[in-house]
Amino acid sequence: DETIERVIRRELESRGWTIGTAESATGGLVGRRLTSLPGASATFRGSVVAYASDLKTSILGVPESTIDEHGVVSEATAEAMALGARAVLGVDVAVAVTGSAGPEPLEQPVGTMIVAVATPTTSMVRTLHLPGDRERVRAYAATGALHLVLRAILDS
């Protein structure tokens, strides 16, 4: 049974890389999925759930000017979260998610989720427009994040 989590772990192990997450709207779902397999500690180092904007700044090092200029739910903030997570967690690959999961919109329409991945050689950012209620949007965003992680690893 080849799950996305297994493929990511195999690709990380083959490179001797580690991974970590910086999550906001998904509340730790990406980290949960990456740690769902036994032996996850071989590649997974940790996760920061920075739900509050001040934590994005104080823990992940997202510049306040980025949040002021672009907003919390922006590609610039997501990329800064991923780059900050690489540094703070000491990982080769970091994935970050921010967004508006609902039920009330936050800067962007409900269902707007932004995923960023930073590796030693590249960074990728994608804006997803997802259907459904809050939990479905969060679950879809976690799946989208894992697919972007795999793509970024394979492109590195």
PLM region descriptions:
Residues 1-156:
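Short alpha-helical segments enriched in small residues
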